[in-house]
């Protein structure tokens, strides 16, 4: 069985507070995009899982401790599965990029093993093991109003150029430097019921982690300005804790033209075109 495991983009990211358990309460508009890892999953007779990574970003994956290993341990501990599996993952999504590749891999496998029937209780438990962004991969577009709740809205067709400088961002390190917090926001459906209205709303948002990463890596700020200045770019932003930066466009042709120009300016960086799924 071959699965497509999609990347996610944080269209906005507000850090509201730090909880007693050390996690941060956040809010985020987000979407899944068609940049994906390909997962080949099959049941095996052996009494040990076989997990392989290949592709352009496979060397950066921790082979001894990762989301797939953690997921299988978790499901067996709860006696949800008893079988063992061979898993081959072609890593097309950058690692240490803020695109949620590892968490998305676990979510894709979880959906298949549980046939899409995942209770809130199980999802909450799984998130504590896999990652707090796990639930995002069960929704193609939405608004995360807090760590446990997603508000759904009508999907918008959006186009992106993605750029990753040669930087690895540690999520733990970036969050540890958060000192300022943003007010919670309320979602008003009538303000985002069209594509243009939605883009207008999110263009006025921010990623609260972006300034922290820009301070540590000045190239991020330079890159975001270069993306923003391309013709047709609605806004540029960093996703998650970085280091992938993106520009949002209303149409595919304009986005691809901008992508080709930026490739000349930053020849050593990773680039990709993407659209919402």
Task: Give names to the regions the model predicted.
Residues 1-97, 115-121, 160, 164-167:
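ATP-binding N-lobe of GHMP and related small-molecule kinases
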Residues 242-245:
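Conserved glycine-rich beta-strand-loop-beta hairpin in the small C-terminal domain of fold type I
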Residues 51-53, 137-235, 248-268, 272-277:
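Conserved, helical-rich catalytic subdomain that frames metal- and/or nucleotide-binding sites
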Residues 97-126, 136:
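DPxDG-like acidic metal-binding loop motif
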């Amino acid at each position: 069985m071959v699965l497509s495991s999609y990347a996610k983009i944080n269209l906005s990211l507000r850090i509201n507070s730090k909880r007693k358990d050390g996690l941060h309460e956040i809010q985020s508009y987000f979407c899944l995009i068609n940049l994906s890892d390909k997962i080949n999953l099959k049941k095996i007779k052996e009494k040990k899982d076989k997990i392989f990574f290949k592709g352009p970003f496979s060397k950066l994956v921790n082979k001894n401790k990762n989301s797939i290993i953690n997921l299988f341990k978790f499901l067996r501990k709860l006696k949800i599965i008893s079988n063992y599996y061979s898993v081959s993952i072609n890593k097309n999504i950058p690692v240490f990029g803020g695109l949620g590749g590892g968490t998305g891999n676990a979510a894709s496998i979880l959906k298949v093993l549980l046939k899409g029937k995942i209770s809130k209780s199980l999802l909450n438990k799984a998130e504590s093991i896999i990652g707090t962004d796990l639930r995002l991969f069960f929704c193609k577009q939405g608004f995360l109003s807090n760590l446990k709740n997603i508000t759904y809205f009508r999907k918008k067709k959006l186009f992106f150029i993605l750029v990753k400088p040669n930087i690895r961002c540690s999520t733990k390190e970036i969050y540890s430097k958060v000192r300022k917090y943003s007010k919670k926001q309320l979602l008003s459906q009538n303000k985002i019921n069209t594509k243009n209205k939605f883009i207008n709303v999110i263009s006025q948002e921010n990623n609260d982690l972006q300034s922290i990463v820009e301070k540590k890596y000045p190239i991020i700020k330079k890159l975001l300005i270069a993306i923003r200045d391309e013709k047709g770019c609605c806004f540029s932003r960093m996703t998650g804790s970085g280091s992938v930066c993106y520009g949002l466009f209303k149409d595919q042709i304009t986005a691809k033209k901008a992508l080709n120009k930026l490739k000349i300016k930053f020849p050593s960086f990773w680039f990709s075109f993407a659209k919402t799924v």
